[in-house]
Amino acid sequence: MAGGAFIDESGHGGDYEGRVTAFVMITCIVAAMGGLLFGYDIGISGGVISMEDFLTKFFPDVLRQMQNKRGRETEYCKYDNELLTLFTSSLYLAALFASFLASTITRLFGRKVSMVIGSLAFLSGALLNGLAINLEMLIIGRLFLGVGVGFANQSVPLYLSEMAPAKIRGALNIGFQLAITIGILAANIVNYVTPKLQNGIGWRLSLGLAGVPAVMMLVGCFFLPDTPNSILERGNKEKAKEMLQKIRGTMEVEHEFNELCNACEAAKKVKHPWTNIMQARYRPQLTFCTFIPFFQQLTGINVIMFYAPVLFKTIGFGNDASLISAVITGLVNVLSTIVSIYSVDKFGRRALFLQGGFQMIVTQIAVGSMIGWKFGFNGEGNLSGVDADIILALICLYVAGFAWSWGPLGWLVPSEICPLEIRSAGQSLNVSVNMFFTFFIGQFFLTMLCHMKFGLFYFFAGMVLIMTIFIYFLLPETKGVPIEEMGKVWKEHRYWGKYSNNDDGDDVDDDAYF
């Protein structure tokens, strides 16, 4: 594969002692529950904004506008309302800014402290939303939820990457994405049940139940140790070595511990990680911590996850059918993520990126063509039962392609490629870019659908093609490489090597590769 610098596992990961212990498995499973926070919020919003009780309470003008338009708008534009989409997407702006603060706290006080803060903030937001009596209370609750998501998404992937042995780091890190998909599925099921409840109980229950994953994570945090990397970063060598011995299940950890110490010494020399990550020698990390989350959102996946009920209604599904279809796609998302857990450390990151990208391109084009055939440019048309089943099957194939590629790898790769001295900054950059474009897609998707019509699916297919080419030429394989030896991967890559071997941070010729 062009541009792929493959590293033999025996040359890196095989010389560390230890085994996969029950202790490290349990701690990683508990930590991964942080993904439930993000997943539940992604899945719940679309159902809540479709409840008339909720709209009557907080957005009566929007409800009247929608009722007055019935029968006069095209299928593509029937749900286009910026105020409603702002309710969904505003959380992610709060998460964006919180991720920068989380970077500093994670570095100074440890990954565990950031997870506790994230849990408390998310729990506070869930309580405020579930008990909201006015729009101000609702928005403040959304901001607290955003802070919780920002802290959890910044700290949990780092925690998992640092705790896991190199040979199964991918599988354990994907536990975070699996928890996200379980959260989405749980929200889809809640959305199916709660609209049947009267007197405003439905939307309150939907929003308030976000507190359940927050409590689970908060309780779990009290039983989690901090990572050896983080303990060492804060100056306690003896405790760090003891923790490394515990999670590796052996006293023979000298080689790995020495690598951690070397990385820590390098990190101590870095006083301003946000300045350092801009240096030439960190150009690969800067590139992937920026472009992977950017591309992840432009796969179009959150179109399905945010607005699944609305999207299915838009393309002709009935109310119950749209909610059931959202549950089905959520289940496919979970099962396909489980597939990635078993395949990521066997086939590698690049193989999953490329296969998943191809699958998403084909299915997006097929969905766009099907909708264009049935509704045309004017949005007038309808779907037969067979047509609806075909579109649902295509969307499920698309979700599966994402769930074993860009979904988990979008969190795994940025969290494992950065050296300790810029790791918190790199992960914070990853989260902030992800949150910004999550906000962008959430805010403007319904408007884009109204104006671009079925061509929107072609747009996302084109973006997936671009990102697949990007991965093919520029991403080296990181399977089985110990996290503190990741620098060797970049030095051996035919493009990134000129940056990673440039210890002085001088500018280099970008055209040399071409």
From Swiss-Prot:
Q: In terms of domain of life, where is this protein from?
A: Eukaryota
Q: What does UniProt report on the pH dependence of this protein?
A: Optimum pH is 5.5.
Regulation of its activity: Inhibited by uncouplers such as 2,4-dinitrophenol and carbonyl cyanide-m-chlorophenyl-hydrazone.
Spans traversing the lipid bilayer:
20-40, 83-103, 113-133, 138-158, 170-190, 205-225, 291-311, 321-341, 351-371, 390-410, 429-449, 454-474
Looking up InterPro entries in the UniProt record yields:
MFS_dom, MFS_STP/MST-like_plant, MFS_sugar_transport-like, MFS_trans_sf, STP/PLT_plant, Sugar/inositol_transpt, Sugar_transporter_CS
Keyword Transmembrane helix attributed: yes
What are the record's GO terms for cellular component? Answer: plasma membrane; pollen tube
* Cytoplasmic compartment segments: 1-19, 104-112, 159-169, 226-290, 342-350, 411-428, 475-514
The entry's note on the tissues where this protein occurs is: Specifically expressed in germinating pollen and pollen tube (at protein level).
| Single GO MF descriptor | monosaccharide transmembrane transporter activity
Q: Which UniProt keywords apply?
A: Cell membrane, Membrane, Sugar transport, Symport, Transmembrane, Transmembrane helix, Transport
Could you tell me where this protein is found in the cell? Cell membrane
**How does the record classify its membrane topology?**
Multi-pass membrane protein
Which ranges of the sequence are coiled-coil?
Answer: none
Please name the Pfam families in this protein's record. Answer: Sugar_tr
Q: Which NCBIfam families match?
A: SP
Task: Describe the function of this protein.
Answer: Mediates an active uptake of hexoses, probably by sugar/hydrogen symport. Can transport glucose, galactose, mannose, xylose and 3-O-methylglucose, but not fructose and ribose.
Protein family membership = Belongs to the major facilitator superfamily. Sugar transporter (TC 2.A.1.1) family.
The entry's protein name is Sugar transport protein 11
- Which organism was this protein described from? Arabidopsis thaliana (Mouse-ear cress)
Gene name per UniProt: STP11
